[in-house]
C-alpha cells in the first residue's frame, strides 16, 4: 500500500500505524539503563509490598560457589528462578527469593592456592583464609552483576553468604542441635579420601570417570593345609597390606577346585567357569564346602605375618570375581561393616597423602597407586599370584582435583542416617514431596535408601570449624551443648576467625573441665565442616519457619543435586523439624553443546552467556532462549539455535510494534464498553482469553517452553496472519472515531496489555518497554495476570471457527491466481464459496463480515457471471476466485458497487475524507 500511496492524493487520510517504538531492539545497549531504573525504583521490593498479606510463595535459592563467572548453565538456572518469581508475583502471590552464595570449601581454597602458585607453600593458614574470603567476596560481586545483567530481580541488601558471621553461627548452632539430639558422632570409619587434597570427601563430592586398574587373582593359603588356598580377586592390590579377612555369602555354594598343578582353590561354584575363562587355569571340582566349614577356616596373609579370618556378608555376589572377597575394614564400606560385626578394628596403614606408614614397613613412604606393581611382583615372587591383567572400570574421583580417590579409615565426624528411624522417616517424607520430573522421586529414594552415614568433617583450612576440643591430659574429646552454644554466640559476633585467633580456654565457657579426668587444659580440633553441610542448613539460616509445613515452596536446581543439596538439606530438616525443607523439587538437565558434549573452555565449545549472547543479542534473547527449552532434560545448544530464537524475538517485537502503531491516538480510557464491540473483535478477545488461560496454567506448571510455542503461534498466526490482516482495512481506512475502528482499537488495546503482562516474566525488558510506550506510568511488574474468563464466548468461537475452516482454502485459491499472474492484491478478487454439505456461510455470518475475514472485495454463494481466475477445493469446500467488474477505490483498494467511475472513492471513503 505504501508505495502506491506515495503517489496517491488520499494517502494522508489513511491511518497508517505510527509509533516511536523502535523496530530495532538494540537490547545489548538499552537494557542496562532499564536495569538501573528497576533498581532505583525498587520495583522488586514494590512487587512484594503490593502483595503483602497474599498467599506466600518462597523459592529457596541453592547457593552457587563464589568461584568464577556464571556459565550458561548458571544463566539457565537463575533465569528460570526469576521467571518463576515474577510469574508467581503477577499471579497474585507474595513471591520471594533471596539469592545466596556458597563461600567456604575446596572449590575456593583450591583456586586460591592455584592462584598463589609457588607462594602457596609460604602462605600460612591465617593468610590463606583471608585470601579465600576476599576471593569469595570478589566473585559474589561479579556473579551479582551477572544476575542483574540477566534481568533478574533481587535486592542487593537481601542476600545470603555462607561466610557471613550470622550464617556461620547458624551452621554451628544447627550442628550443635544435631549433636545434642544424638545425630552426630565421632568414629573411625573408611571414607572417600583425596590423597591430592588430603581431605575426606562426601558422596556429593564424587564424580565417576573411566579408570584402568590392575585385576589380580590371589591365593590365600589355608592355615594348617598343604597346597590348599582360597582364591580372591581384587582391583586394588594396594589394599592387600590392610587385609584382615575373606568374606563369603552363606547363600552361595562354594567348593574346592583342583588346578593342573595339583593345588586346590576355594571359590564359588557359580564363578568357576568365569575364572577359567579369564585366567586360562583349568578347574576341576573336588568337593563342596559348607558355610559352617568355611567359618572355621583361617588364612595366612600372602606377605604379612598375620592371619586373616572368615567373614560373611550379603554384599558378596556372583557378579564378578570368585565369590571370595578380600576384606580390608579400613578401606571399604562393606568391609568395615562385616569387620565391625566380627569385632575387627579398621586398619589402614596409609597416611593423609596416600603414602604407606610404618605399619607397612616394606613399602613405607611409597604412594599407594605407585605401589601396585611392587605388590603384584611380591605376590608373584611368593607364588601366590594366579593371574594378572588390566581392568577398565568406572572409578570415583575428586570433584575438584579430578584425581582418583581411595577409601581410607580415619577419625571423622559423622551424621547418623539411621538414628531415631531417620532414614525411614525421610523416605516417607520424600513420598509427600512433589518431584518434577516425576522420575526424581525414584532417583532420590534409591540414594537415600543406600547412603552411608554422612562424613561431616574435612581436613582443610577454609570452612566452619567443628567446635570440638581435646583434653591435653587424657586425650578425651570434649564437646557438649553448653560449649557449642557459647562458641555460637562468639561466631555470631565475630565470625569463624575467632576460632583461630583465640586460645582454646577463651573459646570454652569459664570453668569447663574434662568429663573424664577433670583437667581444664584443652587444645582445639583441626576439622572443619563439609561445605555441603553449610548449604544444607541454609533453610534454617535464611528461611522463616512455618507451622507444620516446609519453609520453602520450591527448590530448583540441576538434576545432579539429588545426590547433593536436595539431600544435604533434607537430613538436618528431617532430624530437627521432622519435615523436609521443600514442598516441590524441580530440576533441570545439563547444558551441552549442539553435539551433546559437555561445554568446556579446553574443548572450545562453550557459550559464554555474557560475551556470546547478551553483548550480541541482549538478555531478553537469552531469557527467551531459556523459555524455549524443556529444561527437565539435558539441553543441547549452539550459536545457531540462539540465532533462531533471536529471529522469533523479532516477530514478537514486530507484533508489539504493530499493536502500538495502530493504537496511536487511542488510550485505554477510549475503549468501548464490552457490549458495543463488533463480533469479530469479540471473537479474537475470546481467543485471547483462552491464550491467557493456557499461558497462566503453563507458568503454574513451570512449562515455559509451552508458553514460548504458544506465544510464537499467537503472534505470528492468530494475530499477524489472521486478525491483523482482517482488520487492516478497518484500522487504516475507517474514520478514527468510527464505532468499527474503535471496536478493533479497543480489542488491540486489551491484546497489547494482556500480551505485555503475560510475557513480562520472560521478556522483562521488552514488556516494560512496551508498557511504557503504551503510556503507562507504573511498572508492568506491578500488575496482575488478567482474568479474562468473561471474554470467553464458546458460541461465538464455534460460529467463527466454522467459517474460518474455509479461509485456508480461500488463501490457496488466491495464491494460485497470484502465481499465474492473474491477481495482485486479494482485494482485487471476489469469491464464489460452495460448501459441499450445503451450508450457507452467509446464514452464519453477514456477507460483509465474510469479506473482512477473507480480505476480499466480494463474496458470492454463486458466481454472477464473473471471470474465474483460479479454483481450489478440499473435501468440505470449493472456492473460485472471481474478477470483479466494479472499479477499485483509490483510497482503500476495495472494489465496491457504489463507485461510479475510475478515480472515484467508495461511499465509506467519501464519508471519511469529506
Swiss-Prot record:
Cofactor binding summary note: Binds 1 zinc ion per subunit.
Residues holding Zn(2+): 889, 892, 906, 909
GO molecular function: aminoacyl-tRNA deacylase activity; ATP binding; isoleucine-tRNA ligase activity; tRNA binding; zinc ion binding
Entry-linked Pfam families: Anticodon_1 (PF08264), tRNA-synt_1 (PF00133), zf-FPG_IleRS (PF06827)
Origin: domain of life: Bacteria
SUPFAM superfamilies: Anticodon-binding domain of a subclass of class I aminoacyl-tRNA synthetases, Nucleotidylyl transferase, ValRS/IleRS/LeuRS editing domain
Cofactor(s), by name: Zn(2+)
Gene Ontology BP term (one): isoleucyl-tRNA aminoacylation
EC top class, as a word: ligase
Motif 'HIGH' region location, chain numbering: 64-74
Gene3D superfamilies, per database record: 1.10.730.20, HUPs, Ile-tRNA synthetase CP2 domain-like
Record bears the keyword Transcription: no
Positions that bind ATP: 601
Subunit structure: Monomer.
PANTHER family (UniProt xref): ISOLEUCINE--TRNA LIGASE, MITOCHONDRIAL, SOLEUCYL-TRNA SYNTHETASE
Protein family membership: Belongs to the class-I aminoacyl-tRNA synthetase family. IleS type 1 subfamily.
Function according to Swiss-Prot or TrEMBL: Catalyzes the attachment of isoleucine to tRNA(Ile). As IleRS can inadvertently accommodate and process structurally similar amino acids such as valine, to avoid such errors it has two additional distinct tRNA(Ile)-dependent editing activities. One activity is designated as 'pretransfer' editing and involves the hydrolysis of activated Val-AMP. The other activity is designated 'posttransfer' editing and involves deacylation of mischarged Val-tRNA(Ile).
Protein name: Isoleucine--tRNA ligase
